[in-house]
Protein backbone atom coordinates (compact mmCIF):
# COMPACT_ATOMS: atom_id res chain seq x y z
CA UNK A 1 0.00 0.00 0.00
CA UNK A 2 2.83 2.37 0.66
CA UNK A 3 6.27 3.20 -0.60
CA UNK A 4 8.05 4.28 2.56
CA UNK A 5 5.43 6.52 4.09
CA UNK A 6 3.64 7.60 0.90
CA UNK A 7 0.35 6.05 -0.18
CA UNK A 8 0.66 4.42 -3.62
CA UNK A 9 -2.62 3.53 -5.36
CA UNK A 10 -2.47 0.95 -8.16
CA UNK A 11 -3.58 2.09 -11.62
CA UNK A 12 -5.55 2.04 -13.89
CA UNK A 13 -8.88 2.89 -12.25
CA UNK A 14 -12.52 1.93 -12.52
CA UNK A 15 -14.45 4.98 -11.28
CA UNK A 16 -17.36 4.11 -8.99
CA UNK A 17 -20.22 6.63 -9.21
CA UNK A 18 -22.69 4.73 -7.04
CA UNK A 19 -26.20 6.09 -7.28
CA UNK A 20 -25.55 9.84 -7.04
CA UNK A 21 -27.65 12.07 -9.28
CA UNK A 22 -26.11 15.47 -8.42
CA UNK A 23 -23.20 16.23 -10.78
CA UNK A 24 -21.44 18.13 -7.99
CA UNK A 25 -21.40 14.96 -5.91
CA UNK A 26 -19.19 13.34 -8.56
CA UNK A 27 -16.62 16.15 -8.73
CA UNK A 28 -13.84 13.91 -7.40
CA UNK A 29 -14.33 11.39 -10.20
CA UNK A 30 -14.67 14.22 -12.70
CA UNK A 31 -11.37 15.71 -11.53
CA UNK A 32 -9.59 12.37 -11.88
CA UNK A 33 -10.93 11.92 -15.41
CA UNK A 34 -10.12 15.52 -16.40
CA UNK A 35 -6.49 15.40 -15.31
CA UNK A 36 -5.63 11.71 -15.74
CA UNK A 37 -7.89 10.33 -18.50
CA UNK A 38 -5.27 7.76 -19.43
CA UNK A 39 -5.70 5.92 -16.10
CA UNK A 40 -9.53 5.85 -16.19
CA UNK A 41 -10.69 2.68 -17.97
CA UNK A 42 -14.38 3.15 -17.31
CA UNK A 43 -17.16 3.95 -14.86
CA UNK A 44 -19.58 1.83 -12.87
CA UNK A 45 -23.06 3.17 -12.07
CA UNK A 46 -25.64 1.44 -9.92
CA UNK A 47 -28.70 3.02 -11.58
CA UNK A 48 -29.53 4.46 -15.01
CA UNK A 49 -30.17 7.82 -13.30
CA UNK A 50 -26.67 8.01 -11.84
CA UNK A 51 -24.54 10.85 -13.18
CA UNK A 52 -22.18 9.93 -16.02
CA UNK A 53 -18.71 11.19 -16.88
CA UNK A 54 -19.06 9.99 -20.46
CA UNK A 55 -16.74 7.06 -19.82
CA UNK A 56 -17.62 3.53 -20.89
CA UNK A 57 -20.01 1.86 -18.45
CA UNK A 58 -18.43 -1.38 -17.25
CA UNK A 59 -19.20 -4.24 -14.94
CA UNK A 60 -16.55 -5.29 -12.46
CA UNK A 61 -15.83 -8.31 -14.62
CA UNK A 62 -15.38 -6.24 -17.78
CA UNK A 63 -13.13 -3.76 -16.01
CA UNK A 64 -10.96 -6.52 -14.60
CA UNK A 65 -10.59 -8.06 -18.05
CA UNK A 66 -9.48 -4.64 -19.33
CA UNK A 67 -6.80 -4.48 -16.62
CA UNK A 68 -8.36 -2.20 -13.98
CA UNK A 69 -6.53 -2.45 -10.66
CA UNK A 70 -8.39 -0.12 -8.30
CA UNK A 71 -12.06 0.72 -7.80
CA UNK A 72 -12.14 4.42 -6.88
CA UNK A 73 -15.10 5.89 -5.02
CA UNK A 74 -15.33 9.14 -6.93
CA UNK A 75 -18.33 10.63 -5.17
CA UNK A 76 -19.25 12.55 -2.04
CA UNK A 77 -22.42 12.67 0.03
CA UNK A 78 -23.65 14.41 3.20
CA UNK A 79 -21.70 13.08 6.16
CA UNK A 80 -19.26 11.14 4.01
CA UNK A 81 -20.86 7.81 4.94
CA UNK A 82 -20.65 4.80 2.63
CA UNK A 83 -24.31 3.93 1.84
CA UNK A 84 -25.61 0.43 2.39
CA UNK A 85 -26.65 0.28 -1.28
CA UNK A 86 -22.99 0.47 -2.32
CA UNK A 87 -21.64 -2.22 -0.04
CA UNK A 88 -22.47 -5.29 -2.12
CA UNK A 89 -20.56 -3.88 -5.11
CA UNK A 90 -17.58 -2.94 -2.96
CA UNK A 91 -17.52 -6.38 -1.37
CA UNK A 92 -17.73 -8.12 -4.76
CA UNK A 93 -14.88 -5.96 -6.07
CA UNK A 94 -12.69 -6.79 -3.08
CA UNK A 95 -13.43 -10.50 -3.43
CA UNK A 96 -12.36 -10.28 -7.09
CA UNK A 97 -9.03 -8.77 -6.07
CA UNK A 98 -9.67 -5.11 -6.85
CA UNK A 99 -8.00 -2.61 -4.58
CA UNK A 100 -10.44 0.05 -3.34
CA UNK A 101 -9.71 3.75 -2.78
CA UNK A 102 -12.03 6.22 -1.10
CA UNK A 103 -12.02 9.87 -0.10
CA UNK A 104 -15.09 9.49 2.10
CA UNK A 105 -15.01 10.39 5.80
CA UNK A 106 -16.10 6.88 6.79
CA UNK A 107 -13.21 4.45 6.53
CA UNK A 108 -13.57 1.47 4.22
CA UNK A 109 -12.16 -0.69 7.00
CA UNK A 110 -15.19 0.15 9.17
CA UNK A 111 -17.12 -2.22 6.89
CA UNK A 112 -16.10 -5.46 8.59
CA UNK A 113 -16.30 -7.78 5.55
CA UNK A 114 -13.94 -5.48 3.63
CA UNK A 115 -11.53 -5.29 6.55
CA UNK A 116 -11.54 -9.08 6.77
CA UNK A 117 -10.70 -9.43 3.07
CA UNK A 118 -7.80 -6.99 3.46
CA UNK A 119 -6.47 -8.89 6.46
CA UNK A 120 -6.58 -12.06 4.36
CA UNK A 121 -4.53 -10.37 1.64
CA UNK A 122 -7.26 -10.39 -1.00
CA UNK A 123 -7.55 -6.61 -1.35
CA UNK A 124 -5.97 -3.33 -0.28
CA UNK A 125 -8.03 -0.46 1.11
CA UNK A 126 -6.97 3.17 0.70
CA UNK A 127 -8.75 5.76 2.84
CA UNK A 128 -7.06 8.82 1.38
CA UNK A 129 -8.78 11.21 3.80
CA UNK A 130 -6.99 9.48 6.69
CA UNK A 131 -3.32 8.91 7.45
CA UNK A 132 -1.93 6.64 10.16
CA UNK A 133 1.63 5.84 9.04
CA UNK A 134 4.43 7.19 11.30
CA UNK A 135 6.18 10.30 10.00
CA UNK A 136 9.31 12.23 10.94
CA UNK A 137 9.29 15.89 11.90
CA UNK A 138 10.64 18.26 9.29
CA UNK A 139 14.28 19.31 9.43
CA UNK A 140 14.49 22.07 6.82
CA UNK A 141 17.67 20.69 5.26
CA UNK A 142 18.25 21.64 1.63
CA UNK A 143 17.00 18.99 -0.80
CA UNK A 144 17.94 18.29 -4.40
CA UNK A 145 15.40 19.31 -7.04
CA UNK A 146 13.22 22.36 -7.73
CA UNK A 147 9.75 22.91 -6.30
CA UNK A 148 6.66 25.04 -6.89
CA UNK A 149 4.03 25.50 -4.17
CA UNK A 150 0.58 26.99 -4.74
CA UNK A 151 -0.59 29.30 -1.93
CA UNK A 152 -3.75 31.35 -1.50
CA UNK A 153 -5.61 34.27 0.02
CA UNK A 154 -8.08 31.69 1.37
CA UNK A 155 -9.06 28.04 1.08
CA UNK A 156 -10.89 26.81 -2.04
CA UNK A 157 -9.44 29.40 -4.39
CA UNK A 158 -7.97 27.02 -6.99
CA UNK A 159 -4.65 25.81 -5.56
CA UNK A 160 -5.07 22.21 -6.73
CA UNK A 161 -6.40 23.20 -10.16
CA UNK A 162 -3.57 25.68 -10.65
CA UNK A 163 -0.94 23.13 -9.61
CA UNK A 164 -2.31 20.55 -12.04
CA UNK A 165 -2.56 23.11 -14.83
CA UNK A 166 1.06 24.13 -14.22
CA UNK A 167 2.20 20.49 -14.26
CA UNK A 168 0.29 19.86 -17.51
CA UNK A 169 1.68 22.99 -19.17
CA UNK A 170 5.26 22.34 -18.10
CA UNK A 171 5.03 18.82 -19.52
CA UNK A 172 3.75 20.27 -22.79
CA UNK A 173 6.88 22.44 -22.81
CA UNK A 174 9.05 19.30 -22.47
CA UNK A 175 9.77 19.96 -18.80
CA UNK A 176 9.69 16.90 -16.56
CA UNK A 177 7.21 18.03 -13.90
CA UNK A 178 5.42 15.94 -11.28
CA UNK A 179 2.31 16.91 -9.32
CA UNK A 180 2.61 16.18 -5.58
CA UNK A 181 -0.73 15.74 -3.84
CA UNK A 182 -1.58 16.94 -0.34
CA UNK A 183 -5.37 16.54 -0.41
CA UNK A 184 -7.88 13.77 -1.00
CA UNK A 185 -8.83 14.49 -4.60
CA UNK A 186 -5.24 15.27 -5.52
CA UNK A 187 -4.08 11.92 -4.13
CA UNK A 188 -6.63 10.05 -6.23
CA UNK A 189 -5.55 12.02 -9.31
CA UNK A 190 -1.84 11.43 -8.69
CA UNK A 191 -2.20 7.93 -7.28
CA UNK A 192 0.03 8.90 -4.37
CA UNK A 193 0.52 11.52 -1.68
CA UNK A 194 -0.40 12.36 1.90
CA UNK A 195 -3.58 14.11 3.02
CA UNK A 196 -1.95 16.90 5.02
CA UNK A 197 -5.07 17.79 7.00
CA UNK A 198 -5.00 14.26 8.44
CA UNK A 199 -1.45 14.66 9.78
CA UNK A 200 -0.70 15.52 13.42
CA UNK A 201 0.44 19.15 13.55
CA UNK A 202 4.06 18.49 14.57
CA UNK A 203 4.60 16.34 11.48
CA UNK A 204 3.10 18.54 8.73
CA UNK A 205 6.41 19.89 7.43
CA UNK A 206 7.93 16.41 7.68
CA UNK A 207 5.05 15.00 5.64
CA UNK A 208 5.73 17.50 2.86
CA UNK A 209 9.42 16.61 2.94
CA UNK A 210 8.35 12.98 2.49
CA UNK A 211 6.01 13.85 -0.41
CA UNK A 212 8.79 15.74 -2.21
CA UNK A 213 12.14 14.27 -1.12
CA UNK A 214 15.49 14.69 -2.88
CA UNK A 215 15.16 14.08 -6.61
CA UNK A 216 17.37 14.27 -9.70
CA UNK A 217 15.30 12.20 -12.16
CA UNK A 218 12.97 15.03 -13.20
CA UNK A 219 12.92 18.84 -13.27
CA UNK A 220 10.17 20.19 -11.00
CA UNK A 221 7.81 19.04 -8.26
CA UNK A 222 4.52 20.96 -8.30
CA UNK A 223 3.19 20.77 -4.74
CA UNK A 224 -0.53 21.21 -4.10
CA UNK A 225 -1.16 23.91 -1.49
CA UNK A 226 -3.81 23.84 1.24
CA UNK A 227 -5.65 26.53 3.18
CA UNK A 228 -4.21 30.01 3.67
CA UNK A 229 -2.00 31.80 6.17
CA UNK A 230 -4.92 34.20 6.56
CA UNK A 231 -7.65 31.63 7.26
CA UNK A 232 -7.93 31.23 11.05
CA UNK A 233 -9.18 27.67 10.62
CA UNK A 234 -6.40 26.30 8.42
CA UNK A 235 -3.39 28.61 8.71
CA UNK A 236 -1.40 26.01 10.66
CA UNK A 237 -1.59 23.55 7.79
CA UNK A 238 -0.55 26.25 5.31
CA UNK A 239 2.48 27.26 7.38
CA UNK A 240 3.66 23.68 7.71
CA UNK A 241 3.34 23.26 3.95
CA UNK A 242 5.41 26.36 3.31
CA UNK A 243 8.18 25.16 5.60
CA UNK A 244 8.17 21.57 4.33
CA UNK A 245 7.88 22.39 0.64
CA UNK A 246 11.12 24.36 0.60
CA UNK A 247 9.71 25.92 -2.56
CA UNK A 248 11.82 27.77 -5.08
CA UNK A 249 8.67 29.29 -6.57
CA UNK A 250 5.29 30.31 -5.15
CA UNK A 251 2.12 30.76 -7.19
CA UNK A 252 -0.55 32.84 -5.47
CA UNK A 253 -4.21 31.85 -5.98
CA UNK A 254 -7.22 34.12 -5.38
CA UNK A 255 -10.94 34.25 -6.19
CA UNK A 256 -12.23 37.54 -7.56
CA UNK A 257 -15.37 38.74 -5.77
CA UNK A 258 -15.05 36.65 -2.61
CA UNK A 259 -16.45 38.90 0.17
CA UNK A 260 -14.65 37.42 3.19
CA UNK A 261 -12.75 34.37 4.43
CA UNK A 262 -14.82 31.30 3.51
CA UNK A 263 -17.44 30.43 6.15
CA UNK A 264 -16.12 33.22 8.41
CA UNK A 265 -18.00 36.45 7.60
CA UNK A 266 -16.24 38.21 10.48
CA UNK A 267 -12.80 37.56 8.92
CA UNK A 268 -11.63 39.91 6.17
CA UNK A 269 -9.64 38.74 3.18
CA UNK A 270 -6.01 39.88 3.09
CA UNK A 271 -4.73 42.15 0.38
CA UNK A 272 -2.65 40.63 -2.39
CA UNK A 273 0.37 42.53 -1.07
CA UNK A 274 -0.12 41.11 2.44
CA UNK A 275 -0.49 37.60 1.06
CA UNK A 276 2.66 37.81 -1.04
CA UNK A 277 4.72 39.27 1.81
CA UNK A 278 3.57 36.75 4.44
CA UNK A 279 4.01 33.70 2.22
CA UNK A 280 7.46 34.71 1.03
CA UNK A 281 8.56 35.41 4.60
CA UNK A 282 7.38 31.97 5.75
CA UNK A 283 8.81 30.16 2.71
CA UNK A 284 12.21 31.77 3.15
CA UNK A 285 12.71 30.07 6.52
CA UNK A 286 13.64 26.90 4.62
CA UNK A 287 14.50 28.37 1.20
CA UNK A 288 15.91 31.91 1.36
CA UNK A 289 15.70 32.14 -2.45
CA UNK A 290 11.92 31.53 -2.64
CA UNK A 291 10.22 33.88 -5.09
CA UNK A 292 6.77 34.62 -6.48
CA UNK A 293 6.37 33.50 -10.09
CA UNK A 294 2.74 34.29 -10.81
CA UNK A 295 -0.85 34.81 -9.71
CA UNK A 296 -3.72 32.50 -10.67
CA UNK A 297 -7.21 33.95 -10.41
CA UNK A 298 -10.68 32.44 -10.38
CA UNK A 299 -12.52 35.10 -12.39
CA UNK A 300 -15.79 33.21 -12.84
CA UNK A 301 -17.73 36.05 -11.17
CA UNK A 302 -16.91 38.48 -13.98
CA UNK A 303 -17.04 38.43 -17.78
CA UNK A 304 -14.19 36.99 -19.80
CA UNK A 305 -13.46 40.42 -21.29
CA UNK A 306 -13.24 42.00 -17.84
CA UNK A 307 -11.15 39.08 -16.63
CA UNK A 308 -8.62 39.53 -19.42
CA UNK A 309 -8.31 43.23 -18.62
CA UNK A 310 -7.99 42.51 -14.90
CA UNK A 311 -5.20 40.00 -15.50
CA UNK A 312 -3.32 42.55 -17.60
CA UNK A 313 -3.81 45.30 -14.99
CA UNK A 314 -2.62 43.05 -12.17
CA UNK A 315 0.35 41.87 -14.22
CA UNK A 316 1.39 45.49 -14.71
CA UNK A 317 0.84 46.23 -11.01
CA UNK A 318 2.64 43.23 -9.52
CA UNK A 319 5.17 42.68 -12.31
CA UNK A 320 4.36 38.98 -12.46
CA UNK A 321 2.32 36.79 -14.83
CA UNK A 322 -1.37 36.90 -13.87
CA UNK A 323 -3.97 34.57 -15.40
CA UNK A 324 -7.16 32.61 -14.91
CA UNK A 325 -6.04 28.99 -15.47
CA UNK A 326 -9.51 27.92 -16.61
CA UNK A 327 -10.06 30.73 -19.08
CA UNK A 328 -6.57 31.59 -20.27
CA UNK A 329 -4.21 28.78 -19.26
CA UNK A 330 -0.94 29.13 -17.36
CA UNK A 331 1.68 29.41 -20.11
CA UNK A 332 3.08 32.69 -18.82
CA UNK A 333 3.43 31.29 -15.29
CA UNK A 334 5.10 28.15 -16.63
CA UNK A 335 7.51 30.25 -18.69
CA UNK A 336 8.47 32.23 -15.58
CA UNK A 337 9.08 28.99 -13.68
CA UNK A 338 11.39 27.81 -16.45
CA UNK A 339 13.62 30.86 -15.94
CA UNK A 340 14.61 29.64 -12.45
Residue map of PLM features:
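ATP-dependent carboxylate-amine ligase catalytic core
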Residues: 2-46, 53-68, 169-246, 259-267, ...
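Short, hinge-like loop/turn segments at secondary-structure boundaries
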Residues: 58-59, 112-123, 142-145, 194-199, ...
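Extreme N-terminal, non-catalytic leader segments
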Residues: 79-80, 89-147
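Flexible, glycine/proline-enriched loop segments at strand-loop-helix junctions
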Residues: 100-105, 149-157, 194-199
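Conserved catalytic-core segment of NTP-binding enzymes
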Residues: 102, 106-108, 126-130, 205-213, ...
Amino acid sequence: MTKGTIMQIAQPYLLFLGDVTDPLAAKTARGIYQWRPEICLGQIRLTPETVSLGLTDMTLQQAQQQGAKTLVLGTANPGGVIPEAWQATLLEAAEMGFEIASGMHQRLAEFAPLADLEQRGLTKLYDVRHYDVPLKVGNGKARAGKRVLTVGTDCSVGKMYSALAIEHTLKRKNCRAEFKATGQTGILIAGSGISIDAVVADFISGAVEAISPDFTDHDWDIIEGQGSLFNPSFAGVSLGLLHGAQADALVLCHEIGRPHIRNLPHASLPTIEQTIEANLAAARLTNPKAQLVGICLNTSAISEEDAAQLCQDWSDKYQEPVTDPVRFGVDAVADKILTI
